[in-house]
Swiss-Prot record:
Keywords: Aminoacyl-tRNA synthetase, ATP-binding, Cytoplasm, Ligase, Magnesium, Metal-binding, Nucleotide-binding, Protein biosynthesis. The keyword Ligase applies. The lineage of its organism: Bacteria, Pseudomonadati, Pseudomonadota, Gammaproteobacteria, Enterobacterales. It is found in: Cytoplasm. Belongs to the class-II aminoacyl-tRNA synthetase family. Phe-tRNA synthetase alpha subunit type 1 subfamily. Its cofactor is Mg(2+). CDD domains: PheRS_alpha_core (cd00496). Binds 2 magnesium ions per tetramer. This is Phenylalanine--tRNA ligase alpha subunit. It comes from Enterobacter sp. (strain 638). Tetramer of two alpha and two beta subunits.
Amino acid sequence: MSHLAELVANATAAINQASDVAALDNVRVEYLGKKGHLTLQMTTLRELPPEERPAAGAVINEAKEQVQQALNARKSDLESAALNARLAEETIDVSLPGRRIENGGLHPVTRTIDRIESFFGELGFTVATGPEIEDDYHNFDALNIPGHHPARADHDTFWFDATRLLRTQTSGVQIRTMKEQAPPIRIIAPGRVYRNDYDQTHTPMFHQMEGLIVDKNISFTNLKGTLHDFLNNFFEEDLQVRFRPSYFPFTEPSAEVDVMGKNGKWLEVLGCGMVHPNVLRNVGIDPEIYSGFAFGMGMERLTMLRYGVTDLRAFFENDLRFLKQFK
């Protein structure tokens, strides 16, 4: 047992010389491991008389405890030194400019909606909204679309039941506004609409913008002038515009509006017309006193024409390579 002090001294010296945690662990194994120098001292107890073994065992355990405490202290010192060294290497130069956060960008359809709202806002139009789950009265009946009209067919409309559907147009917003507000009325109604169609130029969900004016002495001339100014503003050029006679149940007379494309061909951009007298009567407005015009346009189609996009579905595929072009 006399050489225990020497083993402890040797272990302490080795501990102090360990330059890293790995070397320190080797010292631990050498002295305190299963076959370590101090651990093997316990096997010498069987050579002693039984009455001396407890005292001798206590001395060995005390020696092991001294070495373990030295190991713990040295490990703490080595870990602190390693941490300080790493912190010194990773010091942040606060004088350097920070990393620039990449700015997001508006979706091209959102850009179109904002641009149109801005234009009509300057003309005194206010933005009105309504529910996307609509009833057949506001989506069809009040708009002079009777039960036998093809637009009410299952293959064109997403029906929940006999009376509820996903709105096929934002015209229901016009009906609600005219019921709640007395003329003069001047609104635009942007929003999502739903139709059972999917191809290169159609998707089951798309964005529509409708406009409505109801007042005294509103004429088709007012309609033409408003839309002509809008199209020139939106496309930022003096366009050749054509109003082509058409049919919509809720307007009379009705027209589709075309602009001359760069390829020399007419391109349809929106539909419009004078509010049908039956629609005015349905909302309690006297068509003998008031008149109005309405127009509607697809936001995706206008965006395609403005930016030269050929496939409408690209707006909904979330391809960043496509969307980043519009930042």
